[in-house]
Curated annotation (Swiss-Prot):
Pathway the protein contributes to: Cofactor biosynthesis; (R)-pantothenate biosynthesis; (R)-pantoate from 3-methyl-2-oxobutanoate: step 1/2
Cofactor: Mg(2+)
Main location: cytoplasm
Active site feature: 182 (proton acceptor)
Location in the cell: Cytoplasm
Pfam families xrefs: Pantoate_transf
CC per GO annotation: cytoplasm
Residues the entry annotates as binding 3-methyl-2-oxobutanoate: 44-45, 83, 113
Record bears the keyword Acetylation: no
UniProt protein name: 3-methyl-2-oxobutanoate hydroxymethyltransferase
Note on how the cofactor is bound: Binds 1 Mg(2+) ion per subunit.
Length: 274
């Protein structure tokens, strides 16, 4: 049976960790599906990981649709989540709904992911009201890398931390069914996870999120040119073994450890957040 948004909400309620991996092809999707990974994210990170681009901004809808189709063919039980690429939803309500629906109709995805907070809440509402599950993404949002001044931790001071909390509440109220938190301090991610009713999925945001996500190529150590602080290599010899190790360490709370997380907020500042 296909995993569902309802099953992820139940996991949060039972304090059971959700496993997510970003992958881009039929073969890796089959491995992840066989390893009982909850969610396969067809991330726009494929622009850099697979297509060799400098950032995620240049990947197109047509390219994302092709890779999502491949993953959908390989995943029989895992929930397939498609990243909506840069400017496929920001420009207008019409674009947001039409492009989201293309992922469902043409690529057989089960939901879509968008980056941003209050500023895209209206689009999250429109897409979710059309019957398409929407996952939001806050913190380090790669599509806004030029605005953020590079790939760096977000929410390190009172003002920016409160902004992320406000955005998290806004996307939940708009109908988002889940929230990815990328590169935010551990204690901030913990606070957001406790405030929200929807599950949080962390990447570089500590062990207190309701689940974790890593890129398939990263957790297997296939990218020799780059290793972020939040990445752990599990096994590059046998992909199935590597994915199973990742799954088990997420579920048991071993991963991520302090080594793979960021913590810039002291308790005095944390007490001022609401």
């Amino acid at each position: 049976m296909r995993k569902s948004i309802l099953s992820f909400l139940e996991k949060k309620g039972k304090n059971e960790k959700i496993t997510m991996v970003s992958a881009y092809d039929y073969h890796s999707a089959k491995i992840l599906d066989n390893c009982d990974i909850d969610i396969i994210l067809v991330g726009d990170s494929l622009a850099m990981t697979v297509l060799g681009m400098q950032d995620t901004l240049s990947v197109t809808m047509d390219e994302m649709l092709i890779f999502t189709k491949a993953v959908s063919r390989g995943a029989k039980k895992s929930f397939v989540l498609a990243d909506m690429p840069f400017m496929s939803y920001q420009s207008s309500d019409r674009d947001a709904i039409l492009n989201a629906s293309r992922f469902i109709k043409e690529s057989h995805a089960n939901g879509v992911k968008v980056e941003g907070g209050i500023e895209i809440a209206s689009k999250i509402k429109l897409i979710s009201q059309s019957g398409i599950p929407v996952v939001a993404h806050l913190g380090l949002t790669p599509q806004a890398v030029n605005m953020l001044g590079g790939y760096r931790v977000q929410g390190k001071d009172l003002q920016s931390a409160q902004k992320i909390i406000d955005d998290a509440k806004a996307v939940q109220d708009a109908g988002a069914c889940m929230l990815v938190l990328e590169c935010v301090p551990v204690k901030l991610a913990q606070k957001i996870s406790s405030i929200l009713e929807i599950p949080t999925i962390g990447i570089g945001s500590g062990k207190y999120c309701d689940g974790q996500v890593l890129v398939y190529h990263d957790l297997l150590g296939l990218n020799k040119d780059f290793k972020a602080k939040f990445v752990k290599h599990f096994d590059k010899i046998d992909p199935q073994v590597g994915v199973e190790k990742y799954r088990d360490e997420v579920k048991s709370g071993i991963f991520p450890s302090e080594e793979h997380s960021f913590d810039y907020l002291d308790d005095e500042l944390l007490d001022k957040l609401y």
